[in-house]
Amino acid sequence: METSNILDFETRTFYKTITIGRGRRQQLVNSSGRFCVAFRMEGTRSQLCYRIWKELIPDAVQRYKMIGERISRTQLEYFSGFRYVPSALRMKCDGSILPGIVMEWIEGKKLDAFMTEEWATLSDVQRLTFIRDFYYMCHLLRKNGIAHGDLSCMNILVTPERDIRLVDYDSLFVSEMGRNFYQTTGGAPAFQHPDRTNASYPMLTSLEDDNFSQLVIALSLWVAYFDPSVTQNYDDSNLLFLPGDISGETGSERLRNLKDSDGWKRAEKVATKFGHIPILMKGLESIQYSVNQVPSLLKFVNEEVIISADFYRLLDSADRNVSSMQPVPYCTACGQKFENDEFKFCTACGTKRHTYTVSSSFIPYRHEQSM
């Protein structure tokens, strides 16, 4: 991509493409998906992602207008701000003009790379914090009427600070869409119900699009929490399961493939250690039914549990109740994460930090002192 072919004035004027290699081996830093090619560009103070549509998404302008307004209004930290560019690039070969979007470049590792390269180096508390952050993201997306539509290792980045960021918004659902738009993709095969990946007819997009992928990722994280060695099998943009593990022509075949998989067997080995794991596995057994019957992760956990300092114990569930007053780890107004228990006001919006009473199931466990 030559800079002279970039039609967006601001990008062409203040940014340049980033290349790797030398001479004839020199090439642009880019990544490619089904619909877009994304180029990394560098300015004096920032970097951006210049995404060019190689295949136009149906109703792209309407979709991105709704998506942009929703992201701007909610200000969720998981998304990058962007703007739609109807005339983004002139093709050198034939002069045709392609649309695209300009967005902030997010620095981070894909989820599978983070798991294989860093997970084993984290403490138990750091792993638990990351899992809770994933659950909180799922909660906030649903609370704000958003489904990503293609949650997978390719589209979940982990920053150097271990914050979660989402990329590739072509498949996003926002509540303004209602039941008027079709899904743009079936998603990554190792994360999606077969009804989506093998759909023989267009499926309407909805708030439920992330249900199956959230269960897959949640189970993968918990299995890795108890058995960090499993992350060495998380490669090629897959986690606990491979595409063949989540496939089949009939419900019974799908369930059999899932339960015969190495990932399922790894989950069974640690299932007795934590009461939430069998619940997630039961949720994934919905693979034998239609995609409309897949439960949301949020059916099994609510906001009070996620923000609780007793997150682990509440999910593990036991018989004896213990009540305690706890400060919330996230601002209830804007969602900003408090760095430690000393902060009494949100540093982002100034809202006073709330506390709440937890009546939880108490089981002594290895994080009791460090949490």
Language-model region placement:
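Conserved protein kinase catalytic/activation segment
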Residues: 155-169
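ATP-binding glycine-rich loop module of kinase domains
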Residues: 24-28, 34-81
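Catalytic-loop of the protein kinase fold
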Residues: 138-159
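Juxta-kinase regulatory segment immediately upstream of eukaryotic protein kinase catalytic domains
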Residues: 1-29, 62-63
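Short Cys/His-rich micro-motifs in 6-15 aa windows
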Residues: 329, 348-360
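Helical subdomain adjoining the active site within ATP-dependent kinase catalytic cores
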Residues: 223-325
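Conserved structural core of kinase catalytic domains
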Residues: 78-124
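Conserved activation segment of eukaryotic-like protein kinases, specifically the C-terminal portion
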Residues: 180-196
